């Protein structure tokens, strides 16, 4: 568990998966072992000794102005997915966020930077054969543009993540489609960063003269800080 402070805001990172299974050939074809070797600071945290990318699926838990905010909800348990590492998982995510002070019943906001299966999975959980919102007291915040896109899209080859992880939230009355400048607290707000998806947003955090940005999938790996054109 990693934790940072940005002024009065606390940010905690909860990792669901972290490994070298990400295919550079698909996601970042220029990130070859030879090219990565030239970026020395990537080892040992972001690249293996063999030159493979280390990537993670994680949530960020944000405490601001008395509000508990979960940013991106990872993969989830019990979800049918074509990617083997994502399929029918049985992880301890809820135990880990509870240990960080974010018991699911006490979360105030859930924010998805975009609507892809590795960012929406724990929006819901399987209860007696039904997908129900994991966070029963939370307002779920979605980019209106991203939901308009996903709502009309055919079921993805990756799995029906709209059906099992997003629509049940709207069915419960907890889902809200918002503009890309929506403000969650005085210290935390959305900013439009489309491209990876039509309505992708980043989350800006500013408090007491300090700032941070949660970029979602604006970038896929730290190597892109050194090589943005990848």
What are these regions (language model features)?
Residues 1-102, 106-118, 125, 134-192, 210-216:
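Metallo-beta-lactamase
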Residues 45-50, 128-129, 190-191:
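Short, P/G- and charge-enriched loop/turn segments at secondary-structure junctions
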Residues 61, 191, 201-223, 228:
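Metal-dependent phosphodiesterase/nuclease catalytic metal-binding core
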Residues 74-76, 116, 146, 194, ...:
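Catalytic metal-binding/acid-base residues of hydrolase active sites
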Residues 82-84, 120-130:
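Metal-dependent catalytic neighborhoods of phosphoester/phosphodiester hydrolases
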Residues 120-122, 189-201:
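Active-site glycine- and acidic-residue-rich loops that bind
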